[in-house]
């Protein structure tokens, strides 16, 4: 059974038109936003995210990035999504700036969870139709519903 995005992303963790000048400022801002929900300090969150980014950018191309890391002491998987205005350089694989960022924080002990979460988010964000709509929506509720909608079975 594939992981659903709504199992780790709540409507209150959708942020539209976040403005940060660069990747490090952006990750720090997202860590500050996530910290109260997960019971970790923003410093701990950003340190692990930066360690992961040093292994290779989590910018997957097409203006989308999925920064993620695993944390000891985290009780359950957590997601946060931000649409950026303006887009920032994320050293993505296609060298295009990023304007849709999906932050994933995963418990260290949850072996397969983070791969399932990454797969769920990448499948959804790979749809050009979905990402184009996410770039234009002004209502957080509709943004959340589009992001968490289960793809139709054919």
Predicted regions and their residues:
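Cytosolic covalent-transfer regions centered on His/Cys nucleophiles
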Residues: 1-154
